[in-house]
């Protein structure tokens, strides 16, 4: 449901352990300076059971790894506490791209 890229290279793809564990892989990041986080809906995903969600705690983790941009797909991601999320992104100069 999510991945992390640097430029045009995919560095990490979320697995069964979840988004937080994937982000934690970059907790000591010093090598990559153009990280992009992408949140998406899996093919044939059942919305009633598992819907892509992002909230302030995830964004705080992304801030720690110095993410430059976050890409979400319109009507495919639930944003928890949207106002706080947008403030966190703005205050940390993270670009939000909605496709």
Q: What are these regions, as identified by a protein language model?
A:
Residues 1-63, 78:
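Conserved mixed alpha/beta catalytic, RNA-binding, or beta-rich assembly cores of soluble enzyme
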Residues 60-69, 73-99:
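C-terminal binding/interaction regions
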């Amino acid at each position: 449901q999510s991945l992390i890229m640097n430029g045009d290279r995919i560095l990490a793809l979320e697995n069964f352990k979840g988004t937080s564990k994937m982000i934690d892989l970059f907790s000591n990041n010093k090598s990559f300076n153009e990280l992009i986080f992408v949140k998406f809906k899996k093919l044939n995903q059942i919305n009633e059971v598992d819907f892509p969600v992002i909230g302030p705690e995830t964004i705080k983790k992304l801030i720690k790894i110095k993410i430059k941009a976050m890409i979400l797909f319109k009507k495919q991601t639930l944003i928890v506490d949207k106002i706080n999320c947008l403030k966190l992104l703005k205050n940390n100069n993270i670009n939000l791209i909605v496709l």
